[in-house]
Amino acid sequence: MRISIFGLGYVGAVCAGCLSARGHDVVGVDISSTKIDLINNGKSPIVEPGLEELLQKGISTGKLRGTTDFAEAIRATDLSMICVGTPSKKNGDLELDYIESVCREIGYVLRDKATRHTIVVRSTVLPGTVANVVIPILEDCSGKKAGVDFGVAVNPEFLRESTAIKDYDLPPMTVIGEFDKASGDVLQSLYEELDAPIIRKDIAVAEMIKYTCNVWHATKVTFANEIGNIAKAVGVDGREVMDVVCQDKALNLSQYYMRPGFAFGGSCLPKDVRALTYRASSLDVEAPLLNSLMRSNTSQVQNAFDMVASYDTRKVALLGLSFKAGTDDLRESPLVELAEMLIGKGFDLSIFDSNVEYARVHGANKDYIESKIPHVSSLLNSDFDQVINDSDVIILGNRDERFRALANKTPEGKRVIDLVGFMTNATSEDGRAEGICW
């Protein structure tokens, strides 16, 4: 394929070297004549192991060249990758001047280009940037229509400096955000020879995936550091702790706790978070991330309440009261907290949970109910159909399989709030079901 790459920094230079090495005809474009001279002489504009050899091969075989002439590069190619920087502004927002400038240059050339051209945003941009910035500029400057006259896609990169060549050749996945199927097809053809799954999504989803991955990596580093700091303060080697923690692939390093949804609860997690952060504080160990966990958890309960309150009705069914399906344990259940908030604000609440029957609650659960919701016996109803029929808003609170059907086929005249991810799609067909995170 004939490819032009705009921006020859870390991402652009690596892409130019790797794509030309795989037989594609690549034109590297940059406003810096110094970078272009380096490329055309087979020299790397950045320090990256193995890159200079790829660039030399590309130049010697005629598969790679560099230019400062934007228009010539666009006319000579079928696909353009935008790899320019998106640095931070002082307020933390992204500086999009470079992307906007490149899009204008591409758009002006597309106005007179007869063949279809595909524009791929490889730069890291916030969700909505392509839809609200890139496409409008391209359409305005070209006088053409995205998805009809030219293609648009997003292709987030997962390259790490110092291992970028290996990361390109052996990616964990290839993410394609496509404005239209034809654009996705063109981009997919570049990566089919790589041994990695190709995941095609909408553009905004692809934009968000990149940020989610990077923020998750930052979170893991911060988490490990805070655990290490606390461990050292109590005389433990934090490396030993994390080595063992990372051996658990069923829970610790898995999808199990990585599903967006409702707050955590139960007799362990809240208690243990509080205990560890208290100990850290008593030892004068700073743990900002860990200290934020309970606040964030409480905020998610508030989000669920706000969703209920947004509807013009007071009759609410809460399906599930225990913190998870298959147990009657109500200790620190976020659903109990939600029920308490609803009752306190005057909602007419009915609760169904087959595992929680007041007459059979003993010990800690009985004490917990009597201290948090003394009148819970009058709110619990073992008649599932009656609870549904007597409500206007139905909250799916835990993953009891009996609740699943309500997420995708909302009863007539009802609203459903899904806290657990039973909804098959982000929106229900009738528009009367809504997820807390989707």
From Swiss-Prot:
It catalyses: GDP-alpha-D-mannose + 2 NAD(+) + H2O = GDP-alpha-D-mannuronate + 2 NADH + 3 H(+). Catalyzes the oxidation of guanosine diphospho-D-mannose (GDP-D-mannose) to GDP-D-mannuronic acid, a precursor for alginate polymerization. The alginate layer causes a mucoid phenotype and provides a protective barrier against host immune defenses and antibiotics. It comes from Pseudomonas savastanoi pv. phaseolicola. The keyword Oxidoreductase applies. Gene3D superfamilies: 1.20.5.170, NAD(P)-binding Rossmann-like Domain. The keyword Translocase does not apply. Its EC number is 1.1.1.132. The gene is algD. GO terms for molecular function: GDP-mannose 6-dehydrogenase activity; NAD binding. GDP-alpha-D-mannuronate binds at residues 161, 210, 214, 217, 225, 256-257, 259, 262, 265, 324. This is GDP-mannose 6-dehydrogenase. Pathway: Glycan biosynthesis; alginate biosynthesis. NAD(+) binds at residues 10-11, 30, 35, 86, 124, 271, 331. InterPro entries: 6-PGluconate_DH-like_C_sf, GDPman_DH, NAD(P)-bd_dom_sf, UDP-Glc/GDP-Man, UDP-Glc/GDP-Man_DH_C, UDP-Glc/GDP-Man_DH_C_sf, UDP-Glc/GDP-Man_DH_dimer, UDP-Glc/GDP-Man_DH_N.
